């Protein structure tokens, strides 16, 4: 299926990666791969059959919400324009577009009701 704006990545935000990682790896048979995320600490990749399928990160000052939760990313072609459009449509930019090395550009916006969604303009590996 070649769909426009698909959900392309899921990420767990938790202050206890060890407990959450153990839980989900045992529940679903996922493997864990930890990588250094610099100032953000450890980023953990959930893997199945050697493929990255989701991520896990520590909360940051820019991370919307409280407690542990999952969030999803929707692919967009032009993240800067999409963030501007979100504001024009009555939403808010919660985390401005910024680069993530080897991933692309990401941001978080909310709709007028407060529902949060994360956007990603993936790096072009072609």
Which stretches of residues belong to each language-model region?
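Preference for short coil/turn "hinge" residues that link or interrupt alpha-helices
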Residues: 49, 72, 90-93
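Core segments of cupin and vicinal oxygen chelate
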Residues: 2-51, 88
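Residue-level preference for alpha-helix termini and adjacent loops
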Residues: 22, 69-72, 99
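Conserved short beta-strand elements that form part of the metal-binding/catalytic scaffold
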Residues: 30-67, 112, 116-122
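Residues in flexible loops and secondary-structure boundaries
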Residues: 15, 20, 40, 54, ...
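Vicinal oxygen chelate
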Residues: 1-15, 33-36, 45, 62-85, 105-110, ...
């Amino acid at each position: 299926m070649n769909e426009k704006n698909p959900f392309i990545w899921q990420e767990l935000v938790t202050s206890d990666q060890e407990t959450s990682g153990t839980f989900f790896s045992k529940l679903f048979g996922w493997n864990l791969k930890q990588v250094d995320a610099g100032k953000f600490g450890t980023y953990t990749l959930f893997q199945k059959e050697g493929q990255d399928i989701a991520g896990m990160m520590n909360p940051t000052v820019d991370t919307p919400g409280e407690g542990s939760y999952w969030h999803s990313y929707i692919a967009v072609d032009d993240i800067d324009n999409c963030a501007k459009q979100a504001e024009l449509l009555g939403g808010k930019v919660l985390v401005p577009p910024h680069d993530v090395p080897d991933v692309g550009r990401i941001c978080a916006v909310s709709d007028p009701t407060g529902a949060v969604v994360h956007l990603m303009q993936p790096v072009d590996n072609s």
